[in-house]
Amino acid sequence: MSVITKVTTYDFRFPTSATFSGSDAMNPDPDYSSAYVVVSTDAGDSGNGFVFTIGRGNDVVVRAIDSMSETLIGRNVEELLDNMRLAWDLFVRDSQLRWLGPEKGVEHMAIGAVLSALWDLKAKRAGKPLWLLLSEMEPEELVATLDFRYLTDALTAQEAIDILRAAQEGKAERIAHLKEVGYPGYSTAAGWLGYSDEKMVRLAKQETEVMGFKQIKLKVGQNLEDDLRRLKLAREAVGPDIAIAVDANQVWDVPQAIEWIGKFKDYDLAWVEEPTCPDDVLGHAAIQKAIDPIPVATGEQMQNRVMYKQYLQAGSFKVMQIDATRVAGPQEIVLEYLLAKKFGVKVCPHAGGVGLCEAVSPVSYTHLTLPTTPYV
């Protein structure tokens, strides 16, 4: 038997605002940051987790993670790792902690970092990357770790098992393909709003011609004339065969979004991302209906599985963009993938930032190897 002996946190920050990297209409000066946690045991091993932020407030998340150390220190490691649903319940269903959410905000993100660290430790002890550990779990075993409270009007545990069972066929081939080819992605490197036209065009060509990306994304929403000019320049730079998405980062009201997006109709958009407030389920539904067939994409600031359920039930988007560090770790992400499969919605997780690509990789790879739903 081993026990958890130490929970160590770090406040990492990078001055990305100095070069406008990460800049958009809502967040013009982000300093990419990470609230990082290491959960250590008396056996000498450890698991790592983190939360991505954009600067101020990163210390608040660190303190929230610190506050959970008393729940972990002294715990039997094997008891937790053998029953990850118990680990989930310790934090998500804590009768006092949940008052701070419930299941949203700093408290929920901090829980996600801790649960991710435990999953990381579980994978290390199994001698496998986390994505492979998840992919190789039997459907019943994986579903037993999941919390279906508030979801059963949309997805039951048995439906989840059936979805995963149906995905077993061809899984070995998909795992082999993933190991050989990797997971598809797109680039936002050219698209930050603070970049000059010249820099945007240069990077758009570099990302597509040199790096080989088949899709780029531009930030929009600050000035319509600028958006139209940049879209025109980007399309001329990359040609007709490269997909272009745009991202407004929640800056528009609903009528404004519909009007603004209407001006983009000539640019064959892959999707319009975060057109309005992430809590506005019906507003997104109205936008999706108005701009169809252009897909609405959103999810990076959705706080929990219940929000995803409501978005899906309302037909509010066509592309789900889960943020791996905003929700409560791998278990909640798997639930959201299963919901996407149930409702036939594509998935393209939120990435970039400090560590987000690394955080989303295990669940993205799992998503591809299961697979639970079509991916973008």
Regions found by a protein language model. Give the residues of each.
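N-terminal capping/lid subdomain adjacent to the active-site entrance of alpha/beta enzymes
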Residues: 2-244, 249-258, 262-266
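Substrate-binding cleft/loops of secretory-pathway carbohydrate-active enzymes
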Residues: 357-365
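Proline-centered helix-kink/hinge sites
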Residues: 15, 275, 295, 370-371
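Catalytic core of soluble alpha/beta enzymes
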Residues: 218-354, 358
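Single conserved hydrophobic/aromatic residue that forms the stacking wall/gate
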Residues: 367-376
